[in-house]
Curated annotation (Swiss-Prot):
This is Ribonuclease H. Mg(2+) 2 binds at residues 10, 135. The keyword Membrane does not apply. One of its GO terms (biological process) is DNA replication, removal of RNA primer. It holds the Pfam family RNase_H. It catalyses: Endonucleolytic cleavage to 5'-phosphomonoester. It is found in: Cytoplasm.
Length: 146
């Protein structure tokens, strides 16, 4: 039986583009693991995607994952079918422009084939303590690398 994991993720950028950080919480039963990272030159969207990728890559075996993010870019790409359309259209948007962050989207595609992932949208910077903690982790990663 696959483990059921709850993941919260967030990305942040000081300037967009600029220095960026990401944070994630992985929860299994009573255990919680915090992870975070930094990039010296990036965008907010890349950090949002990186948080999800790093969290999913942390899992040692295929799992059932409920991933919560305040990123409409991430959640809508999956839940609204954008990612499927982009791949079907050779990584072009409906406006025939190249999709941004293809390298990260390709990693996400690989990871969501390995894990059974359901994406959930949460309101950012509100009363969700898990999302707020991820935001703190992302901002701290930036601060620690100034």
């Amino acid at each position: 039986m696959q483990k059921k994991i709850i993941v919260y993720t967030d990305g942040a950028c000081s300037g967009n583009p600029g220095k960026g950080g990401w944070g994630a919480l992985l929860m299994y039963g009573a255990s919680t693991r915090e992870i975070s990272g930094y990039s010296p030159a990036t965008t907010n969207n890349r950090m949002e995607l990186s948080a999800a990728i790093e969290a999913l890559e942390t899992l040692k075996e295929p799992c059932i994952v409920h991933l919560y993010s305040d990123s409409s870019y991430l959640v809508n790409a999956i839940n609204e079918g954008w990612l499927k359309r982009w791949t079907a259209n050779n990584w072009k948007t409906a406006a025939k422009k190249s999709v941004e962050n293809i390298d990260l989207w390709q990693k996400i595609l690989t990871l969501i084939k390995l894990h059974d992932v359901t994406f959930h949208k949460v309101k950012g910077h509100s009363d969700n303590p898990y999302n707020n903690r991820c935001d703190e982790l992302a901002r701290q990663a930036i601060k620690n690398n100034r």
